[in-house]
UniProtKB/Swiss-Prot annotation:
Organism the protein comes from: Homo sapiens (Human)
Subcellular location: Cell membrane
Free-text domain note: The VWFA domain (or beta I domain) contains three cation-binding sites: the ligand-associated metal ion-binding site (LIMBS or SyMBS), the metal ion-dependent adhesion site (MIDAS), and the adjacent MIDAS site (ADMIDAS). This domain is also part of the ligand-binding site. The MIDAS site is required for both rolling and adhesion. The ADMIDAS site is required for rolling and mediates the negative regulatory effects of higher Ca(2+) concentration on ligand binding. The LIMBS site is required for adhesion and mediates the positive regulatory effects of low Ca(2+) concentrations on ligand binding.
The keyword Nucleotide-binding belongs to this UniProt entry's keyword annotation: no
TM helices/strands, residue ranges: 724-746
Ranges of residues in domain VWFA: 150-389
Residues annotated with Phosphotyrosine modification: 778
SUPFAM superfamilies attached to this UniProt entry: EGF/Laminin, Integrin beta tail domain, Integrin domains, Plexin repeat, vWA-like
Protein name: Integrin beta-7
Function: Integrin ITGA4/ITGB7 (alpha-4/beta-7) (Peyer patches-specific homing receptor LPAM-1) is an adhesion molecule that mediates lymphocyte migration and homing to gut-associated lymphoid tissue (GALT). Integrin ITGA4/ITGB7 interacts with the cell surface adhesion molecules MADCAM1 which is normally expressed by the vascular endothelium of the gastrointestinal tract. Also interacts with VCAM1 and fibronectin, an extracellular matrix component. It recognizes one or more domains within the alternatively spliced CS-1 region of fibronectin.
Keywords attached to this entry: Calcium, Cell adhesion, Cell membrane, Disulfide bond, EGF-like domain, Glycoprotein, Host cell receptor for virus entry, Integrin, Magnesium, Membrane, Metal-binding, Phosphoprotein, Receptor, Repeat, Signal, Transmembrane, Transmembrane helix
Length: 798
């Protein structure tokens, strides 16, 4: 029978999404999602009608609970703003309500090695309470120490189909050697054994009675009846018991190429009590020489019920319901292994290796090794895989409640080096014994949780875990809460967070009027301009108890001011450097402009030699606005004016090299300059580039010191290159190249023409059709005469 590795690889790739979703630790509880339709995590802080809605609307929002904080006509929603804005508007710091998320470490035993790996503390802290404000992340520090000699449980799961006959002989002598090698890295190790073949129905196994009793090819061989999974030996530290039980095993047989290994893996992970797993590092060694059946294959044998994910071992250790349930999916296997904290090691032959390599990508913290044809290298393969798995630390979480997001940063090599963020897990590779690695776990909630949630973090393959108690901060803790407060019109409402909550039938900011007075003309007159007939509250609010309660960003006695109508700079109100009040930007210190777009600094306006804008302009927004006739960033240029380089060229040359037009009176003509030689590299375009009369190239930089003296930093002279020879040779070479090109082009065109004509001639020759014909004047010398009597004699007589 021929294996189908490529088909299985394709199936594995298609099931990747399923396994990645399924292979999470089971949830400890589900939380119901609750959302406030007024809230959004996007944008900046916006006004909100209450303290609770304010702190939920955006993580940057704060609430001012000071009494009478809002101005006349200003909505109470304006109490909700950024901390800086509220302080700028006069809210005392002690009156700010700005709850922040926090974390509290409840249990933090220090990391320790323990005695021979037993009792080691490898993960810290152990329990943390985290309170999340929606939209605000909280970061946890999780430390892991790789302890020496951590205990190990190893379960050897072997394919006993007939093709594994040679391997079984080798495994019968494996127990002692495997224990000895494992005891080199840990002082507490136990091993167990299980085997598998396939489901005992067609087309996987022959159901002919004689074949069910003896499925091997020849009668002389020792052979057992086929089975799905058989748990042979529970985990033990007795190597002789392992070798004795394995020695009693014999191979079996099946029909098709893939084996029923998934059934065996699932039962070994689910039946923890029967297998005898301890709460230590758990390894499952899976050996086979072929691929595996997966979910859906059972339908070929009339098995339609999906695997139920429960243990079904009978008293003899056999999987008793293998013919009732289909094979498990990759996702089910990955989830069961992850939930049981088991690390699988797939030891397979070269023919099946590509399939199991793809499978390993879908199962967290698994390893694959190539098994020799007779399993002679299985001990070394197990040791290599164990060392690889134990040196890889993978931090993973249980299922998250709706609305909570998590990300990881891994700090593997030191405090300065952090790996990139990952959404699903944190991982450090090649962790040495006694080395401590750190993970930064960031938690963020988008909305409130109806109840606390327990989140579990653990390092795969290790028994310890960190329990995180997740709470959400969804209300204000105002200390001024007062029922029937005197501030609210002598007890007509309750005071909470600086705002009156009126009793039934009462209205107004201070509950000062009743519902019956709501439409009184006298009250409405207070919401219009004197002798005005326009809409109440300028159409930007509603009239309540004779006062305007403005909506949105409007304010003022009649809501006449719009605090969102100020000019914007780069799309931001007041450029982000001021506060908009009644259509006018009130800029922060050192900012000017209608949209606070200008900085008060003038550094960019000071020229090296001419002061502010070279004396030919004024500085506005840290940029020079030049007078008529001048231009340039510093107003230092004009039509017909010399550039700074031209003005100072002669002084730079005579001061540095004692040459040039001013060489004889340099000290007098250049008294206002200070020339120095500079060996610094030329970093920008501010350097002047000039030549002396003898073609010497030099550079200099014009600067201005604090005393108003012009400083010229001159680089040493550089001999100008003579390009005459290069120009002449280039011209000659160009002419020659053009001539050769023309000749070659002509010859090429002639060649193409000749080839085309010759090809046409050959084609015409092939189409000639010479016909053979006779001369019409020619008469043959042969005459043929037919005897009619001869023809009658040949005819039969009737």
């Amino acid at each position: 029978m021929v294996a189908l590795p490529m088909v299985l690889v394709l199936l594995l790739v298609l099931s990747r999404g399923e396994s990645e979703l399924d292979a999470k630790i089971p949830s400890t509880g589900d939380a119901t999602e609750w959302r406030n339709p007024h809230l959004s995590m996007l944008g900046s802080c916006q006004p909100a009608p209450s303290c609770q809605k304010c702190i939920l609307s955006h993580p940057s929002c704060a609430w001012c609970k000071q009494l009478n904080f809002t101005a006349s006509g200003e909505a109470e929603a304006r109490r909700c703003a950024r901390r800086e804005e509220l302080l700028a508007r006069g809210c005392p710091l002690e009156e700010l309500e700005e709850p922040r998320g926090q974390q509290e470490v409840l249990q933090d035993q220090p990391l320790s090695q323990g005695a021979r790996g037993e009792g080691a503390t490898q993960l810290a802290p152990q329990r943390v309470r985290v309170t999340l404000r929606p939209g605000e992340p909280q970061q946890l520090q999780v430390r892991f120490l790789r302890a020496e000699g951590y205990p190990v449980d190893l379960y050897y799961l072997m394919d006993l189909s007939y093709s594994m006959k040679d391997d079984l002989e080798r495994v019968r002598q494996l127990g002692h050697a495997l224990l000895v090698r494992l005891q080199e890295v840990t002082h507490s190790v136990r091993i167990g054994f299980g085997s598998f073949v396939d489901k005992t129905v067609l087309p996987f196994v022959s159901t002919v009675p004689s074949k069910l009793r003896h499925p091997c090819p020849t009668r002389l061989e020792r052979c057992q009846s086929p089975f799905s999974f058989h748990h042979v030996l529970s985990l033990t530290g007795d190597a002789q018991a392992f070798e004795r039980e394995v020695g009693r095993q014999s191979v079996s047989g099946n029909l098709d190429s893939p084996e029923g290994g998934f059934d065996a893996i699932l039962q070994a992970a689910l039946c923890q009590e029967q297998i005898g797993w301890r709460n230590v590092s758990r390894l499952l060694v899976f050996t086979s020489d072929d691929t595996f059946h997966t979910a859906g294959d059972g339908k070929l044998g009339g098995i339609f019920m999906p695997s139920d994910g429960h243990c079904h071992l009978d008293s003899n250790g056999l999987y008793s319901r293998s013919t009732e349930f289909d094979y498990p999916s990759v996702g089910q296997v990955a989830q069961a292994l992850s939930a049981a904290n088991i690390q699988p090691i797939f030891a397979v032959t070269s023919a099946a290796l590509p399939v199991y390599q793809e499978l390993s990508k879908l199962i967290p913290k698994s390893a694959v090794g190539e098994l020799s044809e007779d399993s002679s290298n299985v001990v070394q393969l197990i040791m290599d895989a164990y060392n690889s798995l134990s040196s890889t630390v993978t931090l993973e979480h249980s299922s998250l409640p709706p609305g909570v997001h998590i990300s990881y940063e891994s700090q593997c090599e030191g405090p300065e080096k952090r790996e990139g963020k990952a959404e699903d897990r944190g991982q450090c590779n090649h962790v040495r014994i006694n080395q401590t690695v750190t993970f930064w776990v960031s938690l963020q909630a988008t909305h409130c949780l109806p109840e606390p949630h327990l989140l579990r973090l653990r390092a795969l393959g290790f028994s310890e875990e960190l329990i995180v108690e997740l709470h959400t901060l969804c209300d204000c803790n105002c200390s001024d809460t007062q029922p029937q407060a005197p501030h609210c019109s002598d007890g007509q409402g309750h005071l909470q967070c600086g705002v009156c909550s009126c009793a039934p039938g009462r209205l107004g900011r201070l509950c000062e009027c009743s519902v019956a007075e709501l439409s009184s003309p006298d009250l409405e007159s207070g919401c219009r301009a004197p002798n005005g007939t326009g809409p109440l509250c300028s159409g930007k609010g509603h009239c309540q108890c004779g006062r305007c309660s403005c909506s949105g960003q409007s304010s003022g006695h009649l809501c006449e001011c719009d605090d969102a109508s100020c000019e914007r700079h780069e799309g931001i109100l007041c450029g982000g450097f001021g506060r908009c009040q009644c259509g006018v930007c009130h800029c922060h210190a050192n900012r000017t402009g209608r949209a606070c777009e200008c900085s008060g600094d003038m550094d960019s306006c000071i020229s090296p030699e001419g002061g502010l804008c070279s004396g030919h302009g004024r500085c506005k927004c840290n940029r020079c606005q030049c007078l008529d006739g001048y231009y340039g960033a510093l107003c230092d240029q004009c039509p017909g004016c010399k550039t700074p380089c031209e003005r100072h060229r002669d002084c730079a040359e005579c001061g540095a090299f004692r040459t040039g037009p001013l060489a004889t009176n340099c000290s007098t003509a250049c008294a206002h300059t200070n020339v120095t030689l500079a060996l610094a590299p030329i970093l920008d375009d501010g350097w002047c580039k000039e030549r002396t009369l003898d073609n010497q190239l030099f550079f200099f930089l014009v600067e201005d010191d604090a005393r108003g003296t012009v400083v010229l930093r001159v680089r040493p002279q550089e001999k100008g290159a003579d390009h005459t020879q290069a120009i002449v040779l280039g011209c000659v070479g160009g002419i020659v190249a053009v001539g050769l090109g023309l000749v070659l082009a002509y010859r090429l065109s002639v060649e193409i023409y000749d080839r085309r004509e010759y090809s046409r001639f050959e084609k015409e020759q092939q189409q000639l059709n010479w016909k053979q014909d006779s001369n019409p004047l020619y008469k043959s010398a042969i005459t043929t005469t037919i005897n009619p009597r001869f023809q009658e004699a040949d005819s039969p007589t009737l």
